[in-house]
């Protein structure tokens, strides 16, 4: 599981930062990539990475402001042109489907795959399958804006082969049943409870991605105990009044959430073009005064999300 930042800027593209798009790479977990927001020129940023558009199976839009959205029609068309033929699901606020369908219709763009649209509820679970659970919550922005909590399901414990061998359980197809936790009867009449031969489950990871917002209660709930919190930081601590006026967050807002929610790592993105060089370092350092494990991300940064231990 990795996060790749395709764009980390705010408002409009800049030399140092493109507008927002984040790839959650789940290649080992389900051979997929999920995109969160698709700002203008996202597909140009993808050309600088190893990411394959056909691997993108889900797209999540935090809100419908242009710096999070204007790259979507072009990406969808290029995915089709480059051999993508598997269905793609887009999760977004009301109006997402109208925007996409209209853009494709007026440009006479024809896709080689089916699109499915899911309108985000104000709060609720939008995905719950064998490997992941995803919930969203409405935030506090000028228009409807959402945050997402992506929870990986726990990985089953490993089969303790050495223990089985020590207890004289011969290898064979029976091991598969034991790994499933079944009770099996051996040829010598012994009953083996599979649950006694499975190690502790590997606790799944949690990633929280927060769209444009002022500070609000929903953020802390979405971020609770997350391995990684990706939070917008449009402004620095000196611009708290401006941030609130424009329905955005500061680095200090984000750091306080990370501390309160007991997250493991805070990644700050959606950085205003006014912050360059030393100013970016100050954004990071000021946040670290509150929450030490903080990083201001840059375009094309790639972060691995490691496991953090097994369940007791």
UniProtKB/Swiss-Prot annotation:
Its EC number(s): 3.1.26.11
Active site, UniProt feature: 67
Catalysed reaction, written as an equation: Endonucleolytic cleavage of RNA, removing extra 3' nucleotides from tRNA precursor, generating 3' termini of tRNAs. A 3'-hydroxy group is left at the tRNA terminus and a 5'-phosphoryl group is left at the trailer molecule
Disulphide connectivity of cysteines: none
Keyword Endoplasmic reticulum: no
Residues binding Zn(2+) 1, per UniProt: 63, 65, 141, 212
Family annotation (CDD domains): RNaseZ_ZiPD-like_MBL-fold (cd07717)
Residue numbers binding Zn(2+) 2: 67-68, 212, 270
UniProt keywords, alphabetically: Endonuclease, Hydrolase, Metal-binding, Nuclease, tRNA processing, Zinc
Record text on cofactor binding: Binds 2 Zn(2+) ions.
Superkingdom field: Bacteria
Top enzyme class: hydrolase
GO molecular function: 3'-tRNA processing endoribonuclease activity; zinc ion binding
Keyword set includes Ribosomal protein: no
Cofactor(s) recorded in Swiss-Prot or TrEMBL: Zn(2+)
Record-stated family: Belongs to the RNase Z family.
The protein's assembly and partners: Homodimer.
General function of this protein: Zinc phosphodiesterase, which displays some tRNA 3'-processing endonuclease activity. Probably involved in tRNA maturation, by removing a 3'-trailer from precursor tRNA.
PANTHER family: ZINC PHOSPHODIESTERASE ELAC PROTEIN 1
Name listed for the protein in its UniProt record: Ribonuclease Z
Source organism of the structure: Latilactobacillus sakei subsp. sakei (strain 23K) (Lactobacillus sakei subsp. sakei)
Name of the encoding gene: rnz
